[in-house]
From Swiss-Prot:
Family label: Belongs to the AB hydrolase superfamily. Carboxylesterase BioH family.
Gene Ontology CC annotations of this record: cytoplasm
Record flagged with keyword Transmembrane helix: no
Keywords tagged on the record: Biotin biosynthesis, Cytoplasm, Hydrolase, Serine esterase
Top-level enzyme category: hydrolase
This enzyme's EC code(s): 3.1.1.85
Listed HAMAP family: Carboxylester
Positions annotated as active site in the UniProt record: 82 (nucleophile), 207, 235
Reaction it catalyzes: 6-carboxyhexanoyl-[ACP] methyl ester + H2O = 6-carboxyhexanoyl-[ACP] + methanol + H(+)
Protein name as catalogued: Pimeloyl-[acyl-carrier protein] methyl ester esterase
Biological or metabolic pathway of the protein: Cofactor biosynthesis; biotin biosynthesis
């Protein structure tokens, strides 16, 4: 039986589901889960194939979203970080009646660089896929180091991410590859133009994976959404700026 690992804490009248990024697991939220569970009923999830949600293999974005929805509350704010942002966005597109608000963190509707679009160069993603089969622990560590580069607390933030990864069994190589395939191929720029719920996009100014140039482009493409840039954060603003991060979510709660 393939089970999604799911933990619920807090007693808030609004549910908040947190979806982590590639290679990680729900332990990444431990820096903010106490604070958030005093305002929300908080749901911590290991995405299929990651952390404690074992036995899935590589999934498409649509299948990943459906697997996560099985155990989800009827209505919630869905927050997704990085790859998790694509999963949360997919749920908002296919089941809008279950999403009170959509929050994406250091995420892009199209992670891969295109002619007219800043992002991760496709050969970099392909390189990660190649290196995974050679030395996958080192490849994951390199990817984590990329996420915190440039911040004042880069070293300790990278340590926090590494600790999260090492706390639980590593995902299977095919699961990690499948996640990179989603980052390489998915493009939700047009579909997300029409999501009906409040939509908040959070970014780090120093992010090396989601260039800040996408922010004004998406402001224009999705005029109903709101964006916020953490001036001194990279790819994990909730680790480097936990207080500011939680304030934004509590403020959003008033709008749903």
């Amino acid at each position: 039986m393939n089970n999604i690992w799911w933990q619920t804490k807090g007693q808030g009248n609004v549910h908040l589901v947190l979806l982590h990024g590639w290679g990680l697991n729900a332990e990444v939220w431990r820096c903010i889960d106490e604070e958030l569970s005093s305002h929300f009923t908080l749901h911590l999830v290991d995405l299929p194939g990651f952390g404690r949600s074992q036995g899935f293999g590589a999934l498409s974005l649509a299948d990943m979203a459906e697997a996560v929805l099985q155990q989800a509350p009827d209505k919630a704010i869905w927050l997704g970080w990085s790859l998790g942002g694509l999963v949360a966005s997919q749920i908002a597109l296919t089941h809008p009646e279950r999403v009170q608000a959509l929050v994406t963190v250091a995420s892009s509707p199209c992670f891969s660089a295109r002619d007219d679009w800043p992002g991760i160069k496709p050969d970099v993603l392909a390189g990660f896929q190649q290196q995974l089969s050679d030395d996958f622990q080192r490849t994951v560590e390199r990817f984590l180091a990329l996420q915190t580069m440039g911040t004042e607390t880069a070293r300790q933030d990278a340590r926090a991410l590494k600790k999260t990864v090492l706390a639980l069994p590593m995902p299977e190589v095919d699961v990690l590859n499948g996640g990179l395939e989603i980052l390489k191929t998915v493009d939700l720029r047009q579909p997300l133009q029409n999501v009906p719920m409040p939509f908040l996009r959070l970014y780090g100014y120093l992010d090396g994976l989601v260039p800040r140039k996408v922010v004004p482009m998406l402001d224009k493409l999705w005029p109903r959404s709101k964006s916020y840039i953490f001036a001194k954060a990279a790819h994990a603003p909730f680790i480097s700026h936990p207080v500011e991060f939680c304030h934004l979510l509590v403020a959003l709660k008033q709008r749903v």
